[in-house]
Each structure stands twice: as C-alpha cells, then as structure tokens.
Amino acid sequence: MRRHKSKSIPGRNLRLADQIQKDLAGIIQREIDMTRAGLITLSGVELSADYAHAKVYFTVLGAEPDTAAALLNEKAGWLHSQLYKLLHIHTVPTLRFVHDLQITRGIEMSVLIDRANRPGPHSGVPDEPEDQS
C-alpha cells in the first residue's frame, strides 16, 4: 500500500498563523491610528491550506465591531505589504478581518448560567433562611 506524503510541514500552518498574528498586532499598534475603532485585540489567524488567504479574528472594546472591521479591511492591502517585509515566505496571504464572536458568546453563556444558578422562587433551591434574632 502506497502512502502519500504530505507536502506541508507539520505544524507550519500554526506557526505561520501565530507569526502573522504577532506581526500584525505590532504593525497595527505602531502604525495605524485606531482611535475611531476602539481598542482592538487580534485573537487568532486562520490560514487557507495554500496560505493564500488569512482570516484575522479580532475583538474590540469601545467601538462598534463593524466600524473596526471596516477600518481594518480598508487597511488590509497596506498591512499585507508590511507583512511581506517582515515574513520571509514566498506567498503572504491576503488578509480579511472578522469580528471574533467567541468571547461575546462566552460572556452571554456565563450570564445565562449565573441566572440559571441563582436561587429564586421557581428554582427549587430554598432561599437563605432569615435570621430571627
């Protein structure tokens, strides 16, 4: 039985995604005026198999996610050229910025869990007895 060797180096995708995230965070912090877009944190990078495209996930505080996404995607071409100068690879991926909803959903789930665990008249959990001193 013949085995086909993978042409990609194991873990390369993850290492490259981490490096892109690190470099982009530095470029955005140093070079782009993000006062309109609030405080932006890059939370992850997802690369296509051929490294031609990258989804860059971000979270934002102090501004609307759509405003931040529009500003980042407007600067994507310039950010691509800056990455090209830093990364020593043949193909630097085209960048697309996407608001990361995982943190927002996590907070919503935490609130729902706290609400469900809160003692109340319909929860089946008795309220704290009142002190009758």
Swiss-Prot record:
GO terms for biological process: maturation of SSU-rRNA. Transmembrane segments: none annotated. Keywords: Cytoplasm, Ribosome biogenesis. GO terms for molecular function: ribosomal small subunit binding. The keyword Cytoplasm applies. The keyword Plastid does not apply. It is found in: Cytoplasm. One of its GO terms (cellular component) is cytosol. One of several proteins that assist in the late maturation steps of the functional core of the 30S ribosomal subunit. Associates with free 30S ribosomal subunits (but not with 30S subunits that are part of 70S ribosomes or polysomes). Required for efficient processing of 16S rRNA. May interact with the 5'-terminal helix region of 16S rRNA. Belongs to the RbfA family. HAMAP family: RbfA. Monomer. Binds 30S ribosomal subunits, but not 50S ribosomal subunits or 70S ribosomes. PANTHER family: RIBOSOME-BINDING FACTOR A, CHLOROPLASTIC-RELATED. This is Ribosome-binding factor A. It comes from Bordetella parapertussis (strain 12822 / ATCC BAA-587 / NCTC 13253).
